[in-house]
Amino acid sequence: MGISEVQVFLALIIALIPGILADRLGKELNK
């Protein structure tokens, strides 16, 4: 259970990082 939970947590972080970077980049471009 512990290993699978860590894998899911890492997968969520890896999935969110590009979205956060794209959001920041979009805000900078909108200026």
UniProtKB/Swiss-Prot annotation:
One record GO biological process: photosynthesis
Keyword Protein biosynthesis: no
Disulfide feature: none
Main location per the UniProt record: plastid
Pfam families xrefs: PsaM
Alphabetical UniProt keywords: Chloroplast, Membrane, Photosynthesis, Photosystem I, Plastid, Thylakoid, Transmembrane, Transmembrane helix
Superkingdom of origin organism: Eukaryota
InterPro entries found in the cross-reference section: PSI_PsaM (IPR010010), PSI_PsaM_sf (IPR037279)
Keyword Thylakoid (UniProt): yes
Transmembrane segment boundaries: 7-26
Topology term for the membrane: Single-pass membrane protein
Record-stated family: Belongs to the PsaM family.
Family matches, as NCBIfam families: PS_I_psaM
Protein name from the UniProt record: Photosystem I reaction center subunit XII
Native source species: Euglena deses
Gene name of the encoded protein: psaM
